[in-house]
């Protein structure tokens, strides 16, 4: 089972438009029989997990939340498997490592750190360009000379679906 890493803004920074995009994206990911691995909290992570769980294609264990604290109860209600780490923001590396590919939308400092981790381990990031934030800012760029073409700009859910088919 391929795992899609979901990174983006938390509850405070996630606009209604981005949240709705996340729900639709989650529904499409569920239809492709892929699992989600994310930070397990609110905002964009919750939206994608909600879309997965609302899909007729969902299955138990499809949404995995790698939590920053020590309490599984802090996970959003759409997480099937909550993994409390007690590591704070260091859990960002675990999310990136656990995923086969990353989808980034919007994002602040946490998303930036996850994109940087993905770059360092040469993991592809589909950077949604429809919303302001680090995903849009870094789409199509190289962070340094160690790799090329890992931050792939995507302008629609249909483009994301194309990548998921070939994953």
Residue ranges and their predicted role:
Residues 82-86, 147-163:
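Short acidic-hydrophobic, aromatic-tinged amphipathic segments that line or gate anion-handling sites
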Residues 3, 35, 62, 124:
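Residues at the starts of beta-strands that form the adenosine-phosphate
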């Amino acid at each position: 089972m391929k795992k899609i890493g979901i990174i983006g803004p938390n509850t405070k920074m996630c606009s209604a438009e981005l949240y709705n995009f996340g729900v639709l994206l989650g529904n499409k990911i569920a239809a492709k029989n892929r699992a989600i691995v994310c930070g397990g909290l609110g905002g964009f992570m919750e939206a994608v997990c909600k879309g997965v769980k609302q899909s007729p294609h969902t299955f138990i264990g499809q949404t995995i939340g790698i939590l920053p604290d020590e309490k599984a109860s802090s996970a959003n209600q759409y997480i099937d498997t909550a993994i409390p780490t007690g590591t704070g923001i260091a859990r960002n590396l675990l999310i990136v490592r656990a995923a086969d590919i990353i989808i980034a939308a919007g994002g602040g400092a946490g998303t930036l750190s996850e994109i940087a981790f993905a770059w360092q381990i040469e993991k592809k990031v589909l950077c949604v360009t429809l919303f302001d934030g680090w995903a849009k800012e870094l789409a199509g760029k190289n962070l340094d000379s160690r790799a090329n073409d890992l931050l792939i700009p995507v302008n629609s859910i249909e483009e994301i679906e194309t990548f998921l088919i070939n994953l």
